[in-house]
């Protein structure tokens, strides 16, 4: 009966007709099998070089990850989180691409220009957050850091302040470098 119902070989035509006749007489209708639905798998990779920028901005980074998680749930995407240390990043990315997700969002706050070639190791679409990556086929989402700092300096100047200082990380962070450039440009 199973061979007939699943339209398999190994059953004579006469037996096949008799089985189908009984099936129709009894009004049997096979249950529709649910097809396994492939879910979109998204990975969030948090790139860590020195940890200072990530640690000092935990609330900001957590809010980004929370929102990504919320949207993945809303669209029934599977979300995979991965921490990636700069010194082992190449091996980590190569290993991840053995069973690649459908897309990757890189928290790139601590990515520096020498790290950019690592992004080419991804074999799936990539978006970098919190770093203005200028690299072929890599999109990024970042604040307008220079304009932001220029606006702050301009605002303080309009309030009457003439000696405006700037604090920045001792470790290199692209966002901070861009903000510093905006600060210096507005002071001129």
Spell out what each predicted region is.
Residues 40-154:
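Alpha-helical recognition/docking segments in bacterial nutrient-uptake
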Residues 2-39:
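N-terminal helix-turn-helix DNA-binding module of bacterial transcription factors
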Residues 29, 102, 161-163:
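Short acidic/polar active-site loop segments enriched in Thr and Asp
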Residues 22, 67-71, 118, 178-188:
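Alpha-helical structural signal in soluble globular domains
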Residues 13, 17, 66, 154, ...:
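Surface-exposed alpha-helical interface segments used for non-catalytic interactions
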Residues 37-42, 160:
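A short, charged/proline- and glycine-enriched loop
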Residues 152-187:
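An alpha-beta-alpha
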